[in-house]
Amino acid sequence: MSSQPVTFQAPVAPIIPTAWPVDDVLALFNLPFNDLIFRAQTVHRENFDPTEVELATLLSIKTGGCPEDCGYCPQAARYDTGVTAQKILPLEEVLTAAREAKAHGATRFCMGAAWREPKDRDLEKVEEMVREVKAMGLETCATLGMLGEGQAEKLKNAGLDYYNHNLDTAPEFYSNVISTRDYQNRIDTLGRVRGAGIKVCCGGIVGMGESRLQRAGLIAQLCNMDPYPESVPVNNLVQVEGTPLHGTDPIDPLEFVRTVAVARITMPKARVRLSAGRREMGEAIQALCFVAGANSIFYGDKLLTTGNPEAMADQELLEKLGMHTRSTAIDARCDVTPS
């Protein structure tokens, strides 16, 4: 009796809806874990080299003293977190950090400042930083708080590639985290960024006490932007003593992986970035996140004021996984603007 040969069919990425109601996003979260990861990896392979990871470096160019009350942030002036307020860094110090980042393989350099919104005199200094970093062949990104009329255009003219402004969480949970700036303020800034022709970097933070439904609500807000963000940072809350969210029950690591997978499925062409909280994850969870569709990490020993895995540890992990870093500063697949 002869046995029949076993045939395997190559996975086919499912058709991606053009709009995602919260209930549909929640249905993805509720899939059996293996089914969700398989679907996310299939979508990922349709759009990216699954072994490639982008390295981005984040530098705090102005630390502490922020007047906002974000419950997760050690840079808020009203919280006693041990962070000392500092003025904006000198240009040469920023450029030295950018050179080091490029030498270690980073292709994107992000500059963050703890402002509610930048004053024009400070924005001029950032514009100069952007021009000089851009001249090194690095992609440039900035996160400076809310932007007023005309400020996004100034950053665009200086050569800024990306502007980061996170939604943080779902609208329904937002008031549990922040009271000094409303959700519409964030939407307005993102509209100014997009209107100026700057690519959008926008994501959120999980593990702040929100429910799965509220995590689905955050993803729905992101993926229903038109177009959705080119970069989507997924942060795992880093609990800092002195902040209101210190002591919050941590999110289950597999729930974090699910969040990455759902972001990948709903925003297939975006760079999904593992951001804050990687140091607490360990290698196995990070590896699962890469399988789930994450393809960018913040690289370096520190993110603004919180710790990050050492650069050597990141290189060793990528080698273990047989992954390589993105080698060019331009990636057309990150263009999610409808043709």
Curated annotation (Swiss-Prot):
InterPro entries: Aldolase_TIM (IPR013785), BATS_dom (IPR010722), Biotin_synth/BioAB (IPR002684), Biotin_synthase (IPR024177), Elp3/MiaA/NifB-like_rSAM (IPR006638), rSAM (IPR007197). Binds 1 [4Fe-4S] cluster. The cluster is coordinated with 3 cysteines and an exchangeable S-adenosyl-L-methionine. Binds 1 [2Fe-2S] cluster. The cluster is coordinated with 3 cysteines and 1 arginine. CDD domains: Radical_SAM. NCBIfam families: bioB. Homodimer. This is Biotin synthase. Its cofactor is [4Fe-4S] cluster; [2Fe-2S] cluster. Catalyzes the conversion of dethiobiotin (DTB) to biotin by the insertion of a sulfur atom into dethiobiotin via a radical-based mechanism. Pathway: Cofactor biosynthesis; biotin biosynthesis; biotin from 7,8-diaminononanoate: step 2/2.
